[in-house]
């Protein structure tokens, strides 16, 4: 992985060793807590700065969401051997690209003597320094493209959260009269749903609207802590179940290339935290500690990804569902696991929603009178939540939406853009040919995954629309 720029004790860039370039140590030690389109940044108040453990919790929750529980199906789509190996490779590339993004942002803050630059501004300022006159002239479009991708990705995450919570809530409610105290492996029995999944989405909607109106970082940290407690508790019970019963044997080591494309979309979707890296660093009380948080947190995350994906597929085999919680036994213990994880996802919604809200809301509010600012702020936030709910209602297929969002926008933000930014940022500072070749290869890999994965996900959706599923739910005894 590339070297992260060394930081002074005050959090400023001291030295940049990536690609043979050097950065000035000039810059302000304060950072903005907002990831907005505006180029003017307010200094971060010490009272709002977050500690090491708080940032670690935010990072953990940003990457352990609904896509995490879809990894057993992803491994099924790739194969028992290819799946875990590919997860490790994609994870390493993603963390490396996060490191590149941090490196470019830190270098630009020193060069421009800015306190903080977000992902969008990093893209714009990188293009302003690249050798192409056309790109320098149109550098502002780089900011617009990244802003659009961030909005699509994060709102896509939020739509998936709606589907996940609705699917699990439906199963909990409609299986209540089948639920027992004895936890036995499920035996599939298809029953007609009492209520459509969309009804449960609409039930959740008003509570999420109230949740996103909370904007204080300290309060969001409390929500994230609650989400982490419930999520880790439920994950402990899930892992306990996965290892206690004999697994399926003779599972394919390598799956079809068509289903592997769905694996790519799901895998890259699962690394949900790329949009949160720069905002989290800006909110940290001691920014020089952020590289340690990043590597420690992401190493733990990748380890969990591989374990859950492999064990889940080995456990349920061909019956693996879009979310592993839907495979759990129909007993009160594991029904509580679904409820706990859904509560964790509920609070994580606010964390993922923060990124698009901080891009869109200030832009809209700045065009209104000051008397209407608060009303418009709250209205836009509520409208965005309704938009994610509406998207989930239109395409209530958890696995395909995860793969589509991952292929379309997550791959661009996580794999395609950061390597290109490194070339643009350091090209005039004697970046090595090896680094350029490496960056081009990563971007091409991300582009291939984006195009082919998007095609396969859309193809599966069209097949699904031609042969729609019955309005039924899997009830297991």
UniProtKB/Swiss-Prot annotation:
InterPro entries: AA_transpt_TM. The chain crosses the membrane at residues 55-75, 78-98, 145-165, 203-223, 226-246, 260-280, 292-312, 345-365, 375-395, 400-420, 440-460. GO terms for biological process: glycine transport; L-alanine transport; proline transmembrane transport; proton transmembrane transport. GO terms for cellular component: vacuolar membrane. Signal peptide: none annotated. Residues 19-38 have a biased composition (Low complexity). One of its GO terms (molecular function) is glycine transmembrane transporter activity. The keyword Transmembrane helix applies. It is a multi-pass membrane protein. Residues 1-42 are annotated as: Disordered. Residues 1-54, 99-144, 224-225, 281-291, 366-374, 421-439 are cytoplasmic. The keyword Mitochondrion does not apply. It is found in: Membrane. Residues 1-13 have a biased composition (Basic and acidic residues). Keywords: Membrane, Transmembrane, Transmembrane helix. Its main location: membrane. Residues 76-77, 166-202, 247-259, 313-344, 396-399, 461-477 are extracellular. Belongs to the amino acid/polyamine transporter 2 family. This is Proton-coupled amino acid transporter 3. It comes from Rattus norvegicus.
């Amino acid at each position: 992985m590339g070297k992260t720029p060394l930081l002074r004790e005050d959090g400023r860039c001291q030295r940049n060793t990536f690609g043979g370039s050097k950065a000035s140590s000039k810059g302000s030690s304060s950072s903005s807590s907002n990831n907005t389109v505006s180029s003017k940044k307010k200094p971060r108040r010490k009272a709002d700065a977050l500690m090491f453990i708080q940032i670690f919790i935010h990072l953990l929750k940003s990457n352990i969401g609904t896509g995490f529980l879809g990894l057993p199906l992803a491994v099924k789509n790739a194969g028992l051997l290819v799946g875990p190996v590919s997860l490790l490779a994609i994870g390493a590339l993603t963390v490396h690209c996060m490191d590149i993004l941090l490196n470019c942002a830190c270098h630009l803050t020193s060069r421009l003597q800015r306190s903080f630059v977000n992902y969008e501004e990093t893209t714009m300022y990188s293009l302003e320094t690249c050798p192409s006159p056309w790109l320098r002239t149109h550098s502002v479009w780089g900011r617009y493209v990244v802003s659009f991708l961030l909005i699509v990705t994060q709102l896509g995450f939020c739509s998936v959260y709606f589907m996940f919570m609705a699917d699990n809530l439906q199963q909990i409610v409609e299986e209540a009269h089948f639920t027992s105290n004895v936890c036995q492996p499920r035996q599939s029995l298809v029953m007609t749903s009492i209520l459509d999944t969309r009804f449960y989405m609409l039930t959740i909607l008003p509570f999420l609207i109230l949740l996103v109106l909370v904007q204080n970082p300290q309060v969001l940290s409390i929500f994230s802590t609650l989400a982490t407690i419930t999520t880790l508790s439920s994950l402990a019970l899930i892992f306990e179940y996965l290892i206690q019963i004999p697994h399926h044997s003779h599972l394919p080591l390598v799956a079809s290339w068509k289903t592997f494309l769905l694996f790519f979309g799901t895998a890259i979707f699962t690394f949900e935290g790329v949009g949160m890296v720069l905002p989290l660093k800006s909110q940290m009380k001691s920014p020089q500690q952020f590289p340690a948080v990043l590597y420690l947190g992401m190493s733990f995350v990748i380890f969990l990804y591989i374990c859950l994906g492999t064990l889940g597929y080995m456990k349920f085999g061909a019956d693996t569902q879009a979310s592993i919680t839907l495979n759990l036994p129909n007993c009160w213990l594991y029904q509580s696991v679904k409820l706990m994880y859904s509560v964790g996802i509920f609070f994580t919604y606010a964390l993922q929603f923060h990124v698009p809200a901080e891009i869109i809301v200030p832009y809209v509010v700045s065009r209104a009178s000051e008397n209407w600012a608060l009303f418009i702020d709250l209205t836009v936030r509520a409208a965005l939540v309704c938009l994610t709910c509406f998207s989930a209602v239109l395409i209530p297929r958890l696995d395909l939406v995860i793969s589509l969002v991952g292929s379309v926008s997550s791959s661009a933000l996580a794999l395609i853009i950061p390597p290109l930014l490194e070339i643009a940022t350091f090209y005039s500072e004697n970046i090595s040919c090896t680094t350029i070749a490496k960056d081009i290869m990563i971007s091409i890999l991300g582009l291939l995954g984006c195009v082919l994965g998007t095609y396969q996900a859309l193809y599966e959706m069209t097949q699904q629309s031609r042969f729609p599923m019955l309005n039924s739910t899997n009830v297991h005894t």
